[in-house]
């Protein structure tokens, strides 16, 4: 009988504990990590045939590392370092920053593109993941040339 009385007295506290744990589990399940966060920095206005520096910062909230390839695209032909492609390992504790110098002679829309790829000898011990949903991310920026 005493055991039953003890169980009935503990029951409301136990139910409250279970409710709190359930709320925390649901909160953790709703956490969505951003696979890629991109910060594209470049001027919006440039003088024709003047060199412009493009800076692309990339980071992730995933706990696993990824092999990324970063490059620029444009709606007009731009030669030189603009066409360089960077391949690197991106981890949550090691964000990456890439730079390009370009010379434009007319207004252009610049796209900074990051592909998550499968490539060996980039990440330590070749431990890297490729997301199932999407493996290409981009951000657009307009460069007005006067």
Swiss-Prot record:
Glycans are attached at residue 105. Keywords: Disulfide bond, Glycoprotein, Secreted, Signal. SUPFAM superfamilies: E set domains (SSF81296). It is found in: Secreted. It comes from the Eukaryota. Residues 1-28 form the signal peptide. Disulfide bonds join 65-91, 89-123. Gene3D superfamilies: Immunoglobulins. GO terms for molecular function: aspartic-type endopeptidase activity; identical protein binding; IgG binding. Pfam families: SVA. GO terms for cellular component: extracellular space; nucleus. GO terms for biological process: detection of chemical stimulus involved in sensory perception of bitter taste; negative regulation of T cell apoptotic process; positive regulation of gene expression; proteolysis; regulation of immune system process. Its main location: secreted. Belongs to the PIP family. PANTHER family: PROLACTIN-INDUCIBLE PROTEIN, PROLACTIN-INDUCIBLE PROTEIN/SEMINAL VESICLE ANTIGEN. Monomer. Interacts with AZGP1. This is Prolactin-inducible protein homolog.
């Amino acid at each position: 009988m005493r055991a039953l009385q003890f169980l009935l007295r503990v029951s409301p506290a136990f139910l409250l504990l279970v409710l709190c744990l359930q709320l925390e589990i649901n909160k953790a399940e709703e956490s969505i990590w951003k696979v890629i966060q991109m910060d594209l920095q470049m001027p919006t206005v440039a003088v024709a045939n003047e060199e412009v520096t493009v800076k692309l910062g990339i980071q992730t909230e995933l706990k696993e590392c990824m092999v990324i390839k970063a490059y620029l695209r444009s709606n007009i032909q731009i030669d030189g370092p603009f066409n360089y492609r960077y391949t690197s390992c991106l981890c949550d504790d090691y964000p990456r920053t890439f730079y390009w110098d370009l010379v434009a002679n007319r207004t252009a829309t610049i796209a900074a593109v990051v592909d998550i790829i499968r490539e060996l000898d980039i990440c330590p011990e070749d431990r890297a993941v490729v997301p199932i949903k999407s493996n290409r991310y981009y951000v657009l920026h307009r460069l007005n040339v006067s």
